[in-house]
């Protein structure tokens, strides 16, 4: 079966779509093919079809901590945001969420059920799949602290469930970065708590985020991993790069660890500024800054 034949089965597949429509930076080149599976059956059909036809496959979530190069992505890009069911089980103190569900919404569902543990995620704009993939965290919380199990679809087309320990979580790392498995859902193991205390903690974290982060501009969130014993923002400030602009990409005056799109930025602008910061920090401090943001796609011809 050819990929475009799946349209006849009601699967939403589009061609040559600018991915800048979906990324939080508002940058990125086109996807050769773009699909939005609505359920596991559609996802499985898409994965089987690209495997059968040797078509490259890229999976993205909410595209919040992601830079897609200006040349775009060859093959099929899957965006899983239509797979967004969230089920809270108060008796078992768990929340199970599809990969395309927003982690913010998952945190709110836990709160409504009086379950504590996901408060840290109240302002993280990514998807559940992305949070698992990156082991997203904030304000002392990490995804790995609350993961009970993760269900995936392997590139071979088989469904599999990993336990917490099998996920090999590390700082902004998980097993699926190595295997290429597609996260389809995650179950979070939480603790019973007072709904209003949980909500107050979430609102406190959101207040910190609004005060410290440049939410008024498009951005990809935190750009760099934190090196042991150092903070990225102060190093960038000491290096004289806060406020530095290349094209429409600017190192934020509100938080130097963020790069914002102040108007008309391209992915190349972002990457050129990232490389300048890395080069300068290496020269001034002897530290190799690693990117936290996921960078994919091809350069523009």
Curated annotation (Swiss-Prot):
Gene that produces this protein: murB
NCBIfam families per record: murB, PRK13905.1
Annotated compartments: Cytoplasm
UniProt cross-references to InterPro entries, sorted A to Z: FAD-bd_PCMH (IPR016166), FAD-bd_PCMH-like_sf (IPR036318), FAD-bd_PCMH_sub1 (IPR016167), FAD-bd_PCMH_sub2 (IPR016169), MurB (IPR003170), MurB_C (IPR011601), MurB_C_sf (IPR036635), Oxid_FAD_bind_N (IPR006094)
GO biological process, one term: cell wall organization
Matches recorded under Pfam families: FAD_binding_4, MurB_C
CC cofactor: FAD
UniProt keyword list: Cell cycle, Cell division, Cell shape, Cell wall biogenesis/degradation, Cytoplasm, FAD, Flavoprotein, NADP, Oxidoreductase, Peptidoglycan synthesis
Pathways involved: Cell wall biogenesis; peptidoglycan biosynthesis
GO molecular function, one term: UDP-N-acetylmuramate dehydrogenase activity
Protein name as annotated: UDP-N-acetylenolpyruvoylglucosamine reductase
Glycoprotein keyword on record: no
GO cellular component terms listed in the entry, alphabetical order: cytosol
Source organism of the structure: Lactobacillus johnsonii (strain CNCM I-12250 / La1 / NCC 533)
